[in-house]
């Protein structure tokens, strides 16, 4: 990695931490703010969460094309300004219409940030350094969310609207500060308008859908996000309250255990993951999460003490965190390596769209099941976890050797005396 790319990468990581820190201030308290503090009711609060998802689903198909044509930086800056306006609007909104409008702006801006930042990371990294770069991104995101949520919890007061206005103002300020930091980034290999592939949007999507490995990875990604991330604050938390009988403070401890596991284990796990086949790492995560669901089943359906049940439930979240730490240096870099030259933005946006779909469907399916159908809920998501293992092994058969084992590219370059050879580059983009 050149010095210029290294400097750009450091600023991108600072930006990731700032955005996560700002989101951590408000995300845990959004429902309480809309429903109780503003007095708009549970229905409006639920609609706010739905608007977040709908806004993301609307803008993401266009975001990828914009990143390819304009480059990730202009798209990121536009997303940050939009998110800042939405965050500030939420802090000042007093009516349902104003809250929903601001939520749409915040949701759209927040959704577009993900593929734009991911594409900037791709532009500033090489095949062999990409896993570490995405692991650092995930680490800083979780650290920022955790610290932001902790500080926000001490600043917020449910009896004072002004305390929430302060939180949303801080979030908006973080987005604007991130925009300032990102505006100084100079990405040496950032795509230019003239360099982008000259094809229609329909042609770009047709090309993506013609990539069998990318299609299989998208299906696998949907199951990953549906069976894990889509359950954290819906089905699994409902199961914990209704079946396990845990308190809200214990649920908070479980979420903290998840974040702590990621922060503590990320770089230790990275050393192991970097030398393994990506498909097998994802398959191992499926087995690990299957164990997590078994532990969750014991917590709610077993006949142990309440203390044992609570400990098992907290352990479930920690096991999920370990799996997340294994996935962060694996899945996102694989998306980038599957993308043809100049198409990373399109592929990142498509995968972000899959993620949003899974996060929208996951709570809708898991929430009611976790609250009332306890045994079927555990069995269903245990099977989904085993399905992850099957899909990952099947994906491995579609990947080239370099896509599945990126360190091979570096080894081949060394074998050739340090000069990159054509077949390696071609294989990495197959």
Predicted regions mapped to residue ranges:
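Juxtamembrane intracellular "pre-TM" segments in multi-pass secondary transporters
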Residues: 1-10, 186-223, 408-430
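Helix-loop boundary and gating motifs at the non-cytosolic
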Residues: 3-53, 215-255
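Helix-breaking motifs and short loop linkers at transmembrane-helix boundaries and internal kinks
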Residues: 39, 71, 92-97, 299-300
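Helix-to-loop junctions at the C-terminal end of transmembrane segments
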Residues: 58-71, 156, 264-279, 370
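Conserved MFS/SLC helix-loop-helix module at the cytosolic interface between two early adjacent transmembrane helices
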Residues: 58-94
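Structural signature of the two symmetry-related core transmembrane helices
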Residues: 74-89, 280-296
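Cytoplasmic helix-loop-helix junction between adjacent transmembrane helices
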Residues: 102-141
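C-terminal membrane-cytosol helix-exit motif in multi-pass small-molecule transporters
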Residues: 153, 173-193, 391-396
């Amino acid at each position: 990695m050149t010095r210029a790319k290294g400097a750009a990468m450091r600023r991108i990581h600072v930006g990731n931490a700032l955005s996560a820190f700002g989101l951590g201030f408000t995300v845990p308290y959004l429902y309480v703010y809309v429903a109780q503090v503003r007095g708009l009711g549970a229905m409006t609060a639920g609609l706010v969460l739905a608007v977040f998802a709908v806004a993301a689903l609307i803008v993401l198909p266009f975001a990828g094309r914009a990143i390819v044509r304009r480059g990730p930086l202009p798209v990121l800056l536009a997303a940050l300004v939009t998110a800042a306006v939405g965050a500030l609007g939420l802090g000042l909104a007093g009516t349902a219409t104003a809250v929903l409008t601001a939520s749409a702006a915040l949701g759209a801006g927040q959704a577009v940030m993900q593929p734009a930042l991911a594409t900037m990371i791709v532009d500033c990294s090489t095949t062999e350094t990409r896993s570490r770069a995405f692991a650092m991104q995930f680490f800083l995101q979780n650290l920022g969310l955790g610290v932001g949520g902790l500080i926000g919890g001490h600043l917020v007061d449910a009896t004072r609207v002004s305390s929430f206005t302060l939180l949303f103002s801080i979030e908006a300020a973080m987005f604007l500060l991130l925009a300032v930091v990102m505006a100084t980034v100079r990405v040496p290999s950032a795509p230019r308008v003239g360099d982008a592939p000259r094809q229609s949007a329909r042609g770009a999507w047709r090309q993506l859908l013609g990539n069998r490995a990318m299609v299989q990875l998208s299906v696998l990604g949907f199951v990953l996000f549906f069976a894990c991330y889509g359950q954290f604050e819906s089905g699994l938390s409902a199961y914990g309250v209704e079946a396990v009988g845990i308190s809200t403070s214990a649920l908070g401890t479980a979420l903290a255990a998840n974040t702590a596991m990621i922060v503590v284990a990320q770089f230790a796990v990275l050393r192991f993951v970097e030398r393994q086949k990506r498909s097998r790492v994802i398959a191992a995560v499926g087995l690990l999460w299957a164990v997590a669901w078994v532990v969750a089943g014991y917590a709610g359906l077993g006949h142990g003490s309440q203390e044992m049940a609570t400990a098992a439930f907290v352990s479930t979240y920690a096991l999920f965190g370990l799996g997340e730490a294994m996935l962060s240096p694996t899945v996102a870099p694989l998306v980038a390596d599957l993308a043809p030259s100049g198409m990373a933005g399109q592929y990142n946006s498509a995968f972000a769209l899959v993620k949003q779909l899974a996060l929208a469907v996951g709570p809708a399916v898991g929430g009611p099941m976790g609250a009332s159908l306890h045994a079927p809920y555990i069995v269903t998501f245990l099977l989904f976890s085993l399905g992850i293992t099957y899909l990952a092994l099947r994906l491995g058969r579609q990947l080239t050797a370099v896509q599945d084992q990126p360190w091979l590219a570096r080894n081949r370059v060394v074998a050739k005396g340090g000069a990159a050879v054509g077949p390696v580059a071609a294989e990495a983009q197959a």
